[in-house]
Amino acid sequence: MASSLSSKAKTFKSPTKTPTKMYRKSYLSPSSTSLTPPQTPETLTPLRRSSRHVSRKINLGNDPIDLPGKESVEEINLIRKPRKRTNDIVVAEKSKKKKIDPEVSFSPVSPIRSETKKTKKKKRVYYNKVEFDETEFEIGDDVYVKRTEDANPDEEEEEDPEIEDCQICFKSHTNTIMIECDDCLGGFHLNCLKPPLKEVPEGDWICQFCEVKKSGQTLVVVPKPPEGKKLARTMKEKLLSSDLWAARIEKLWKEVDDGVYWIRARWYMIPEETVLGRQRHNLKRELYLTNDFADIEMECVLRHCFVKCPKEFSKASNDGDDVFLCEYEYDVHWGSFKRVAELADGDEDSDQEWNGRKEEEIDYSDEEIEFDDEESVRGVSKSKRGGANSRKGRFFGLEKVGMKRIPEHVRCHKQSELEKAKATLLLATRPKSLPCRSKEMEEITAFIKGSISDDQCLGRCMYIHGVPGTGKTISVLSVMKNLKAEVEAGSVSPYCFVEINGLKLASPENIYSVIYEGLSGHRVGWKKALQSLNERFAEGKKIGKENEKPCILLIDELDVLVTRNQSVLYNILDWPTKPNSKLVVLGIANTMDLPEKLLPRISSRMGIQRLCFGPYNHRQLQEIISTRLEGINAFEKTAIEFASRKVAAISGDARRALEICRRAAEVADYRLKKSNISAKSQLVIMADVEVAIQEMFQAPHIQVMKSVSKLSRIFLTAMVHELYKTGMAETSFDRVATTVSSICLTNGEAFPGWDILLKIGCDLGECRIVLCEPGEKHRLQKLQLNFPSDDVAFALKDNKDLPWLANYL
């Protein structure tokens, strides 16, 4: 990553598209002043809401403005000067047609179908360039956008000083060179510094006030401005403190009806607005390009800023105060990052064009566009109009690929109670609260706080185990979410949190790369990552610009990291024992006795602190389902109780209970639609739950398990028993055969022999009940159940020929 704006002399930035007339290492003092150096906020700023799609309400005043009879027209390279909006035009438009409130038109809530009206689509004329308020804007430009809707545009301009005040003398001189601090981004005159500087030094430069703070001294004497002097903040300071927005212009158009100019903005985010917050590797001027778009009026655009890639950013030492770095894109929906694909600037002038999809809502033929007097006088030809509306060479992301317009009747459809219940009971839906696990969550919270609150933070490990579907992972994530809020409030010391799921790793060794990326933000190979992590946790060396903060490492599916020599688990669990590691490890697995199955040197580090999540009983399952359905009247209480008791008797898996209730809601919805009965007055009854249970527990694969031979049932029971013992979904034929031999010997059954067992395993593989490797591997053949172990237990638990199978299920 490119280094920050180090030791640069700031240069005055004119509000044009590209910086011109710049002086090398000199600057006629541009923007930024305040008593304290500008700092980015320490707390996360809420993400932009849907109200951002509505532009600021412009105060046009009450005095009428006389319009000239005829306006002059200029046309240079398809650059058009928009006319000023006046009160007369707005009043005339209101008298002709009732305007829709922007807050209503952009509301994310689907209106009732009876309230919707079919309105004619607004006609638009698109441009590549527009001159607005004596400033030229073009597709692909980066601009500042007002964030406060009720802000006065005149005040905004007055608060944007063209020449920045010095942080020491609080004066602005047009003939004095200034230098910027790489830590606080404050500007200083060279002769105001102590000792004064004769020229701008090379490399990073930090002001004397930041040096005192970094040295650990609490008493820092910061100069105060003279009495009566008004301190004004620059656009850069407002953006980094979340008082302004930055955006990239994707489209430019004018509404033909009212003559208002609009832009399609693609938003930038500062690191504080992402889910991870500001990390140690983030630069002061770093922004993220998001996949969040909005349509706003040109009145909300203030002026240009300049967002550059790392290569250009490293050469922008003298390009002014409005230069920022963007190296990564940020997905606001998934909270993920990826590198920005750098597009060549010359693509727009190339002969090859992008064949973009025609958009129904914006493309119109020449006959449909009714040009006003200004356009008719200009006599724009069809070829020129097409050139102005095309987006030649502009392709910023794949946000519209594969999209299909949703019919109006679907948008206007109001969800019934059953439809709301089906959406709420989905496993992907995050619950508002987590019932029945308050005791476990309190224990996890106390463990983490005790590990990170002490100044002498020593590493600790906690092993969390329990059968699947008992809320282990979601409980830990809920605790971390609550601790994050306490960190923002200042009641808990800051920490670094890294979450890893073992099933998402290509190999156990890749966990080193994931941990290193979570700490440094860079992705390297696992060998180099292991070396750096050993230096970090064993020797106490920093990774990059890392702060001295504890690290909390959450590893889900910990048993996946078990290798032949168990070196991966040993390294991870050995790091917390080092004096300067400040590492807290939370391991989650399904097996209770996993530490006892590992090497003694690993179990001694892992098995000290344990927390067990037992299966849910029927009352807890009933409370979980009722909490999900709070405010939705779709189920009878007896139906919820019936589903809870049925699942609690088999496995106590909350996910299975939610799936049964969701399927019961689908059955009830189908039944009501088939009988033409209003769904508003009907609820899910016990019969619907019974149908869902029959579908789930009497599926074809369960019927096959019930009908297999006696030895096949013993073979499946041995696989389930082996799964419960080891916690590993995958096992070998050798282990299963040993378990079958032990089960047969204990219960007086004759052991069939290895060859017969191998044939039974292959037969179950042909039925797809078991996933297995080719039989030629014999004893080394790997086996795995193709269905949940609960289904096997349900199919074989009540077997009359072999009643003792229930003891192993």
Swiss-Prot record:
Query: Where, by residue number, does Zn(2+) 1 bind?
Result: C181, C184, C207, C210
- Residues bound to ATP: G466, V467, P468, G469, T470, G471, K472, T473, I474, E557, N590, R655
Q: Where is the BAH domain?
A: 223-341
Residue segments, region Histone H3 binding: 160-185, 201-205, 316-321
Task: Name the phenotypic consequences of knocking out this gene.
Answer: Lethal.
Describe what upregulates or represses it. Answer: Regulated by E2F. Accumulates rapidly after cell cycle reactivation by sucrose addition following cell cycle arrest mediated by sucrose deprivation.
**GO MF terms, alphabetically ordered:** ATP binding; ATP hydrolysis activity; chromatin binding; double-stranded methylated DNA binding; zinc ion binding
Q: Which GO terms describe its cellular component?
A: nucleus; origin recognition complex
Query: Which residues take part in binding Zn(2+) 2?
Result: C166, C169, H189, C192
Entry's SUPFAM superfamilies? FYVE/PHD zinc finger (SSF57903), P-loop containing nucleoside triphosphate hydrolases (SSF52540)
Tissue specificity note: Follow a cell-cycle regulation with a peak at the G1/S-phase. Mostly expressed in siliques, flowers and flower buds, and, to a lower extent, in roots, leaves and stems.
Where do the ZnF regions (PHD-type) fall?
163-213
Q: A Pfam family for this UniProt protein?
A: PHD
Which Gene Ontology BP annotations are present? Answer: DNA replication; regulation of DNA-templated transcription
Q: Where in the cell is it found?
A: Nucleus
Q: Where is the composition biased (Low complexity)?
A: 1-47
- Annotated region (Disordered) at 1-69
Quaternary structure per UniProt? Component of the origin recognition complex (ORC) composed of at least ORC1 (ORC1A or ORC1B), ORC2, ORC3, ORC4, ORC5 and ORC6. ORC is regulated in a cell-cycle and development dependent manner. It is sequentially assembled at the exit from anaphase of mitosis and disassembled as cells enter S phase. Interacts directly with ORC2, ORC3, ORC4 and ORC5. Binds mostly unmodified histone H3, and, with lower efficiency, H3K4me1 H3K4me2 and H3K4me3.
Q: Which family does it belong to?
A: Belongs to the ORC1 family.
Know the name of this protein? Origin of replication complex subunit 1A
Species name? Arabidopsis thaliana (Mouse-ear cress)
